Amino acid sequence: MNVSTTPYQNARLLIDGEWVESQTTEWHDIVNPATQQVLAKVPFATPDEVNAAIAAAQRAFQTWKLTPIGARMRIMLKLQALIREHSKRIATVLSAEQGKTIADAEGDIFRGLEVVEHACSIGTLQMGEFAENVASGVDTYTLRQPIGVCAGLRRSTSRP
């Protein structure tokens, strides 16, 4: 894949398992810092699109929270396999959009894989604690359970 000669396209939003064209009027150019070539345009999602994504995530959570830990782990292992399978392509794209060497981009991918591998061990991380006889005839226990939807937001350093 030659990112430097690939024409850019507008990125779409993934909402409720479907790729959606954004209705926004604000777009962010992803620029190769070495060539100043626009690689892609990424939408600043509209409030309605953000709300639709949140609502979809909340609906999905109702199933996810009932999914056995082993099944969740298999999903994360599949993600790990897909990242490994496509790591060269991902590194090429990272290199072009961030102006870093392929080796540095591959290091980023490796660090990301470490996070995924950590998530694969969630079964042992979700074990609660049990304390016997904390008071006369009273035992206590804690449970670790998924609590809901969260979002990761990052500041764009190149937004006007």
Predicted features and spans:
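Hydrophobic face of amphipathic alpha-helices that form TPR/SEL1-like repeat modules
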Residues: 1-34
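A short local loop/turn or secondary-structure capping micro-motif enriched for an aromatic residue
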Residues: 29-30, 47-50, 160
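Glycine-rich loop-to-alpha-helix module at the N-terminal edge of alpha/beta enzyme cores
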Residues: 39-126, 137
